[in-house]
UniProtKB/Swiss-Prot annotation:
Substrates-to-products reaction catalysed: 5-(methylsulfanyl)-alpha-D-ribose 1-phosphate = 5-(methylsulfanyl)-D-ribulose 1-phosphate
Similarity remark: Belongs to the eIF-2B alpha/beta/delta subunits family. MtnA subfamily.
Upper lineage: Bacteria, Bacillati, Cyanobacteriota, Cyanophyceae, Acaryochloridales
Top EC group: isomerase
HAMAP family: Salvage_MtnA
Binding site residues for substrate: R53, G54, A55, R96, Q205, N256, K257
GO BP field: L-methionine salvage from methylthioadenosine
Protein name: Methylthioribose-1-phosphate isomerase
A GO MF term: S-methyl-5-thioribose-1-phosphate isomerase activity
Physiological role: Catalyzes the interconversion of methylthioribose-1-phosphate (MTR-1-P) into methylthioribulose-1-phosphate (MTRu-1-P).
Length: 355
C-alpha cells in the first residue's frame, strides 16, 4: 500500500549520532523506511544500489561515508590515516560515475583532512563538521535556487503548468530540491496551477518519488508516461520545463536522467522554455563540453523486469544508459544559487560571481 500520510519535512540523508540515516528510496512509495548506515562500505552500497540517489544527495551521502570511513581507522599515525581515507575515497568514487557532486564532496573531505589538528580524534570531528556543513549548505542552496527559478519563470499565465523529468526534489538533495525547489517556490507564491511529472523509465523516479513528494505537500501533480510529454506540449498544456542535473559542462551541456534530451527537443519544437536547476557544485569546470561526461550504464534488469515480472521475451539485447546529455542550445537558462545563466554565459558568469 502506498504511503500517502505526511511524513514531515523530507531530509533523505541525516547524521544520527554515530551513523547515517537514509530514506530508502527503493521502497517508496509503497513504504517509508529509514536505513541505518554504519560503515563506508555500507554507504558505497547504498549509493550504488540507489537507496540514496540524486546528484546533490549522493554528494552529501559520500561526505558522510568519508566520515564513517575515517572512524573505522584503528591506527594512531596521521600518515596512515590519510592513506586509509584515500582508500575510502576510491571506493566511494567507483559507485556512480556521472554525478559530479559525488567527486566534489569527496575532494572537499580530503581537503579538510589536511587541516592540522592536535589529535586524530579532533581531525575526525573536523571531518564530521565539514560533512554537516555540506548538508546544511545544500539545503540553503536549494532554497536559493527555488527563489531564483521563480524569478525567471514565464510571467504569463499567472498560474503556470510546469513539467519535470525524473526527481530533482528533496529526495535528490539534502532537502527542498533543485527543480522541485523551483516548483515549491512557485507553489508557495501562488503561481503554480499544476506540475506534470514524467514517470521516467526505467526506474520510474518521477512516478515513485516526484509524485510522492508532491502528495506529501499537497502540490497538484499529474503523472504522465514519458512518451506523452511532447503531446502535452502540442496541446498547450505545458508553460515551462524545469529539470535537475547530474553534471554540467562549462559550455552548458547538461547530463541528466535518461529521457531529458527528448524532453528538451520537444520543448524547443514548441517554443517552451526549458530550464536546468542545479547548484554550482554540479558544474564540472574541468570539462569543456558534454562529450567528455562519462555516462553510467546500468543492469538491463531495470528494463526487462517490472516488479518481479519479466516483461520482455528471452533473447532480446538491452542498452540501459542511466543519463543522456542535453546540448546547451536547447537550454533556456541554468538556475543556480547565485543566479540564472544562459549556457553561453555560464563559464564567464560563474567566474564573475565566484570572484
Amino acid at each position: 500500500m502506498a504511503v500517502t500520510a505526511n511524513v514531515g519535512t523530507i531530509f533523505p540523508v541525516v547524521w544520527a549520532g554515530d551513523r547515517v540515516q537514509l530514506i530508502d528510496q527503493t521502497r517508496l512509495p509503497e513504504q517509508y523506511e529509514l536505513r541505518e548506515i554504519t560503515t563506508a562500505a555500507e554507504m558505497a552500497t547504498a549509493i550504488r544500489t540507489m537507496i540514496v540517489r540524486g546528484a546533490p544527495a549522493i554528494g552529501v551521502a559520500a561526505a558522510f561515508g568519508m566520515v564513517l570511513g575515517a572512524r573505522e581507522y584503528r591506527g594512531s599515525d596521521r600518515e596512515g590515516f590519510l592513506i586509509h581515507l584515500e582508500n575510502i575515497a576510491s571506493q566511494l568514487r567507483q559507485t556512480r560515475p556521472t554525478a559530479v557532486n559525488l567527486f566534489w564532496a569527496i575532494d572537499r573531505l580530503l581537503a579538510a583532512a589536511q587541516q592540522p589538528t592536535p589529535t586524530l580524534e579532533e581531525l575526525q570531528q573536523h571531518l564530521l563538521e565539514t560533512a554537516q556543513t555540506i548538508a546544511r549548505e545544500d539545503v540553503q542552496t536549494c532554497q536559493a535556487i527555488g527563489k531564483n527559478g521563480l524569478g525567471v519563470l514565464p510571467k504569463t499565465p499567472e498560474k503556470l503548468r510546469l513539467l519535470t523529468h525524473c526527481n530533482a526534489g528533496a529526495l535528490a538533495t539534502a532537502g527542498y530540491g533543485t527543480a522541485l525547489g523551483v516548483v515549491r517556490a512557485a507553489w508557495a507564491a501562488g503561481r503554480l496551477e499544476r506540475l506534470y511529472a514524467d514517470e521516467t523509465r526505467p526506474r520510474l523516479q518521477g512516478a515513485k518519488l516526484t509524485a510522492w513528494e508532491c502528495v506529501q505537500e499537497g502540490i497538484p501533480v499529474t503523472l504522465i508516461a514519458d512518451t506523452m510529454a511532447a503531446h502535452c506540449m502540442q496541446r498547450g498544456m505545458i508553460d515551462a520545463v524545469v529539470v535537475g542535473a547530474d553534471r554540467i559542462a562549462l559550455n552548458g551541456d547538461t547530463a541528466n536522467k535518461i529521457g531529458t534530451y527528448s524532453v528538451a527537443l520537444a520543448a524547443k519544437a514548441h517554443n517552451i522554455p526549458f530550464f536546468v536547476a542545479a547548484p554550482l557544485s554540479t558544474i564540472d569546470t574541468s570539462i569543456a563540453t558534454g562529450a567528455e561526461i562519462p555516462i553510467e550504464e546500468r543492469h538491463p534488469q531495470e528494463i526487462y523486469q517490472v516488479g518481479f515480472s519479466r516483461i520482455t521475451p528471452a533473447g532480446v539485447d538491452f542498452y540501459n544508459p542511466a543519463f543522456d546529455v542535453t546540448p546547451a542550445h536547447l537550454i533556456s537558462g541554468i538556475i543556480t544559487e547565485l543566479g540564472v545563466f544562459a549556457p553561453v554565459d555560464l563559464a564567464r558568469g560563474i567566474g564573475a560571481v565566484s570572484g
